[in-house]
């Protein structure tokens, strides 16, 4: 089980590292990262379920991992570089923590999968309909960009 958890994180981090965000302007790179994360989570619902299960278990198995921090350091480093480029060019506001940016991206992209059934039932909507997903994806990207954008 621990090996499966580690591989799930390794897979997403490997794909993230191949996004070539350094070649894009900071805001475009952030949009690409958030869009990728949204799409990844939607396309890999078992990954979300795995993370949810580990959280239900209070991280008991992940706590045994000798690799999990190293697997996730590149994600934070990438966000840090992207964010610092944006601050240096004046498009992102200073004073934000890259870990918090990552947490915000994760929260907004994770919810759409983790809560699809309850949210859909409560609000009588098909949260996975293509038009609903497209609108939600655009909104999530916009929320994150507005969060980091300089005034």
Identify the function of each model-found stretch.
Residues 1-22, 28, 32-39, 50, ...:
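Alpha-helical structural segments
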Residues 2, 27, 31, 65, ...:
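Short, structured helix-loop boundary elements
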Residues 19-20, 61-65, 125-130:
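A short, mixed-charge helix-start or loop-turn motif at secondary-structure junctions
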Residues 22-26, 44, 58, 151:
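Short coil/turn helix-boundary motifs
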Residues 36-39, 43, 73-92, 104-151:
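C-terminal peripheral helix-coil segments that are non-catalytic and often amphipathic
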Residues 42-66, 115-123:
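Amphipathic alpha-helical segments used for helix-helix packing
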Residues 93-96, 100:
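Alpha-helical transmembrane segments and their helix-start/interface "positive-inside/aromatic belt" motifs
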């Amino acid at each position: 089980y621990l090996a499966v958890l580690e591989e799930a994180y390794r897979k997403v981090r490997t794909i993230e590292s191949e996004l070539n965000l350094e070649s894009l302007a900071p805001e475009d790179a952030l949009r690409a990262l958030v869009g990728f994360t949204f799409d990844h989570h939607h396309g890999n619902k078992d990954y979300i379920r795995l993370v949810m299960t580990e959280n239900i278990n209070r991280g008991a198995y992940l706590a045994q991992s000798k690799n999990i921090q190293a697997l996730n350091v590149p994600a934070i480093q990438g966000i840090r570089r992207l964010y610092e480029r944006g601050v240096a060019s004046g498009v992102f506001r200073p004073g934000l923590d890259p870990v918090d940016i990552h947490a915000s991206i994760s929260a907004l992209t994770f919810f759409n999968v983790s809560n699809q059934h309850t949210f859909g039932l409560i609000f009588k909507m098909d949260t996975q309909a293509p038009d609903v997903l497209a609108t939600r994806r655009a909104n999530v990207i916009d929320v994150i960009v507005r969060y980091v954008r300089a005034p």
